[in-house]
Each structure stands twice: as structure tokens, then as C-alpha cells.
């Protein structure tokens, strides 16, 4: 058996111990562990605790600042920039969203870019935070070049995910978190850890040919052809250029040069519906929209219609009770001394 099930709290503690042992301060270790386990609870294992070993190696090599002290500067009535001091992206995105939420509550909208950052994990964590405050949340981050542009064979863009969180009155928030590539590269890593093949179309080899062996994947494809390609560029503009960071092939690689600071950028936004329309009416209409989608007749071969993020929310409810599934090799690393 190549996977093992453990309690979420045990996973958090094990991740915290590993990061703490690598010199990371307590506050940041707790936040990184929380974001990673959030992903595993939702069965998004590509962004879960499997990344711990990489983070430890990068900390020890000097590629992440273990004592980072992020600094926020308000640049306008509803805008700001957070300098992440080359610390963890999980911490920087979280702080950036906190500032965006604060501005949105007071002024209707808050937009923050984060610079001098690193990998930030699942964006759903941060937009969920806004939705829990009955605000609309949006987050984007660029990554190093691993995705070929539509019609090309050389990787120039990153997986460049984008996420939205929209609150409802009684229903769970609408959470959309997606890579603009066909899949996140973490899914390739997960398949490698679990010894599984991948669906054709996820990735290509050095010749640009589609492969199902995850060990042969050198680049990913965009989702939806030119549509995903276009959205990927938008993400690089917002989280790269707008943040004063690099883009595409000029970004330090995640899995090479572990001693290099990655200097990633992120973009987060929070919107207060009450500055645009009646707050209760908005939340009630969101309930109605979700309900109509869920009650719509399913197509042949489908059990029912789900809204984006709903399946992950159901996984989270179950996994909080039953535990999260992780690769045995990942668990063995977490338990090692």
C-alpha cells in the first residue's frame, strides 16, 4: 500500500516539526503547515504536505529566509504592496489578504501585491479567508516556466493559478481554485510518489509529445488551448509585472538552484459587496444561484451537478473526521529524524 491515512492535526504537527527543525520561526511554520494540510483535507494532495521535504531542503540551502519579516506599505486608498523578505509565500499571501480584507471592509475594495516571495500553496486557503468575512476574494500567483504556450513546444509560462471565493448566506462559499495549465505540476509529483500513470494530455516530454509516464514529463499543457494560454498571461501580468517581479522564464526554478531566492509575486483582492448592492440580497441571490445549479438535471453518466469547490468541501468534511491520505514515502520523511 503506497498511501497512509493520518489525522490532520498529526500531519500539521509533523510538518511543523520538520520546518522548525530546519530553522523556520514558529509563526511561519504554523501557517505553512496549516495551508498544506488545508489542501490535503480537500484531497488536493498536489499542494499538500508532500511539499514539506522540498521546503526543508530549500530552507537548509538558503533559498527561503527562515526569519523573514514581511513589511506592508499602503500605496493608495485601496492598494498596497507587501515585501515578503524572501520568506514563505503561504505567510506572505495570508498577510496580503489580511490587509486587502481590512481595506475592503472600510473602503469597499482592497488590492495587494506581494513581492520577494516564494511558493504559496493552494490559493483556495486565502480566498476562503475573504469569503468567511462575507467578502469576495481573488488571488493569483505566477510560477516558473513549466508550461508550453498554445502552439509551442518550449515552456515559457508557469502553471499560474487563479482563485475566487464568493460568500453565500446559508450555502457554503463558492470556491474556484484552478491552474491555467491542464493540471498543477504537483499532480505530476503526486503521481510519481504513488507510482501511477497520468492521463494523456497532462504533460509532454522534451519533444513536445504527450506522455502518460509522470517521470517523462518535462512540460505541461495549458487547459482549453488558447483560452488557458490567455489566462496564464493575465496571471503573469497581475502577480508578476504589476508586482514588479519577473515573469515566465525569468523566474527562479522551484526544483533547481535551491539556494536561490525565488522572488515570486502574488496578487490578492477583496471586494465588499455592500459597497455595490444590498449585502443581504447579494448573499441570498448567491444562495439561489448555487441552489439552482445544484438542482439542475444531471447529464447522462453524472450523479448530480456540483458547483466549483463543492466536492473539495465535501472531502474536507469527511477528512476532518477520518484523516487525510498521504503517500507512505511522504509520511516516512515526516516521521524521520
Curated annotation (Swiss-Prot):
Which Pfam families does the record associate with it? Answer: Ldh_2
Instruction: Note the SUPFAM superfamilies from the entry.
Output: L-sulfolactate dehydrogenase-like
Respond yes or no to whether keyword Oxidoreductase is given for this record.
Answer: yes
Query: What is the top-level taxon of the source organism?
Result: Bacteria
Q: Give the record's family classification.
A: Belongs to the LDH2/MDH2 oxidoreductase family.
Q: What else is known?
A: Member of the exu locus which is required for galacturonate utilization.
Instruction: Name it.
Output: Uncharacterized oxidoreductase YjmC
Organism, per UniProt? Answer: Bacillus subtilis (strain 168)
What's the encoding gene here?
Answer: yjmC
Amino acid at each position: 500500500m503506497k498511501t497512509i491515512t493520518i489525522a490532520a492535526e498529526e500531519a500539521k504537527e509533523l510538518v511543523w516539526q520538520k520546518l522548525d527543525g530546519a530553522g523556520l520561526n514558529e509563526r511561519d511554520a504554523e501557517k505553512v503547515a496549516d495551508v498544506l494540510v488545508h489542501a490535503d483535507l480537500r484531497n488536493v494532495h498536489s499542494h499538500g504536505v508532500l511539499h514539506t521535504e522540498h521546503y526543508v531542503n530549500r530552507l537548509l540551502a538558503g533559498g527561503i529566509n527562515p526569519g523573514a519579516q514581511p513589511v506592508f506599505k499602503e500605496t493608495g486608498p485601496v492598494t498596497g504592496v507587501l515585501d515578503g523578505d524572501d520568506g514563505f509565500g503561504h505567510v506572505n499571501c495570508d498577510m496580503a489578504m489580511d490587509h486587502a480584507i481590512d481595506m475592503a471592509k472600510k473602503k469597499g475594495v482592497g488590492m495587494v501585491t506581494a513581492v520577494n516571495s516564494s511558493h504559496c500553496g493552494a490559493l483556495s486557503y486565502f480566498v476562503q479567508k475573504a469569503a468567511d468575512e462575507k467578502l469576495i476574494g481573488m488571488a493569483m500567483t505566477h510560477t516558473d516556466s513549466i508550461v508550453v504556450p498554445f502552439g509551442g513546444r518550449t515552456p515559457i509560462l508557469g502553471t499560474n493559478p487563479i482563485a475566487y471565493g464568493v460568500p453565500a448566506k446559508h450555502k457554503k462559499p463558492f470556491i474556484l481554485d484552478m491552474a491555467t495549465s491542464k493540471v498543477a505540476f504537483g499532480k505530476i509529483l503526486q503521481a510519481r510518489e504513488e507510482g501511477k500513470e497520468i492521463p494523456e494530455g497532462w504533460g509532454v516530454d522534451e519533444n513536445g509529445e504527450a506522455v502518460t509516464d509522470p517521470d517523462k514529463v518535462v512540460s505541461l499543457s495549458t487547459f482549453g488551448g488558447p483560452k488557458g494560454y490567455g489566462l496564464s498571461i493575465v496571471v503573469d501580468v497581475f502577480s508578476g509585472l504589476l508586482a514588479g517581479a519577473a515573469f515566465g522564464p525569468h523566474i527562479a526554478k522551484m526544483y533547481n538552484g535551491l539556494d536561490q531566492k525565488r522572488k515570486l509575486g502574488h496578487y490578492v483582492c477583496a471586494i465588499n459587496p455592500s459597497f455595490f448592492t444590498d449585502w443581504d440580497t447579494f448573499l441570498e441571490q448567491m444562495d439561489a444561484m448555487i441552489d439552482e445549479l445544484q438542482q439542475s438535471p444531471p447529464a447522462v453518466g453524472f450523479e448530480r451537478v456540483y458547483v466549483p469547490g463543492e466536492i473539495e468541501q465535501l472531502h474536507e468534511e469527511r477528512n476532518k473526521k477520518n484523516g487525510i491520505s498521504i503517500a507512505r514515502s511522504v509520511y516516512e520523511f515526516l516521521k524521520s529524524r
